[in-house]
Amino acid sequence: MSDGGSAPARRRVCSALAACGVSPLALVLTLILTLVSGCSKPPAPLPNDAYIWQRKWTPSVTSAIAQSSGFVQTWHVLAAEKDSKDDWTLISPDWATLAATRAPVTAVVRIDGQLGDLTTLPIARIVKLADDWKQHGITLAAIEIDHDCATSRLAGYTRFLATLRAQLDPAIKLTITALPAWLGSPALDALLAHADEAVLQVHAVMNPAQGLFDPTQARAWLREFAQHTKHPWRVALPTYGTRVTWGDDGRVAGIESERPMLLANGFAQGVAHELVAQPEQISAFVTRIERDALPGLTGIVWFRLPTDADDRAWSLGTWRAVLTRAPLIAAISADAHQSAQQPGLFDVSLVSGGNTDAPLPAVIRTDASCEAADGINGYALDYDAHGMLLRRVQPGLLRAGMRRDIGWLRCGGVDNKKVSVRVEP
């Protein structure tokens, strides 16, 4: 084994360092500091904002705000809507609940993307809205314009923003919602230059194969967007699912995401798909973009605030776990329990343990010999070489701690204790 060199050699090295005015100890310390500085620090978590998109502030909304106030930096609150018929609707928040959070508020004005002439919009009304909101004991940080216009109309949108910015209180920031579809437009840079901040929306209904959120595509959009703006910006990420019906012509016939809808020519005649934002997928995406540290990216805006009454959003517990970057643990099991009314009839249920809403399993199987069965709530009866099973026909999430009935079994000739069901991925 080597002893690290002879004594004369070590003396020659020390003499050379001394001649240069460098002590061996200083050299060692320099090397250590270089190695330490070369180690990358863990990325700082991006701050969490959230959209309150509910038009009616029900007890479930105010309760969700109260339970989430410690995890949210800024609330983006739907304040007004201008629809395609040129009607103007104001939303009335629960001011006491909003003020109690002590968090900054961004008032969002949604302008229908089909409005072609923005010069007719009452800018004075938006300015007055900002003044009115400041009278309710909240900290109004910004006005956000949500206008999903066609790329060909960005120049007109830019002129509208310039006029609004000139009339808005300089202490209030002007921010906009930006779309990935705009990234190829030469008018985008000018548009973003007239806004103090922007929120890039990377979730949308595009086609059933892509789903509601594509992390690879979203990350590419973020990298490209960072090259177009010199102002701070955030990314909007989904906490919800949506049911989309596609017509025979391949176009979207109906979307059910914020509340149930009955469409006479939609769900009955088209092909429906349940598109779901998976908590594990979104959580992994957040970890990735925090490592990317893209220029100007200052936070996440979650769309939308989950509530106990919102069946199409994550549970509050799952959302908080994602907000705090906690490990997500999904655990779904199945059980069969005998009906109290009919001997031999067993109800089949899924039970979600863990701390996160979990994707519905693809197959539920039983080894019992049953005469009949059927599925409900996203499941249907099917058969394969191994026998009877309940197969998932619509994807979805089962909230943490919740139970869902998915079907029944009629097994009259079987010992009740031997009827069991199991989950197959």
Name each model-derived stretch.
Residues 58-84, 136-140:
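Catalytic domains of carbohydrate-active enzymes, especially glycoside hydrolases
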Residues 75, 145, 198, 235, ...:
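Conserved, mostly hydrophobic/aromatic
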Residues 43-45, 80-197:
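Chitinase-like catalytic core of GlcNAc-active glycosidases
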Residues 344-353:
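Short, well-ordered beta-strand segments enriched in hydrophobic/aromatic residues
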Residues 36-38:
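C-terminal motif of bacterial Sec signal peptides marking the signal peptidase cleavage site
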Residues 338, 353-425:
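C-terminal beta-sandwich/jelly-roll accessory domains of carbohydrate-active enzymes
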Residues 155, 159-260, 271:
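Substrate-binding surface in catalytic domains of secreted glycosidases
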Residues 248-327:
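Substrate-binding cleft of secreted/luminal carbohydrate-active enzymes
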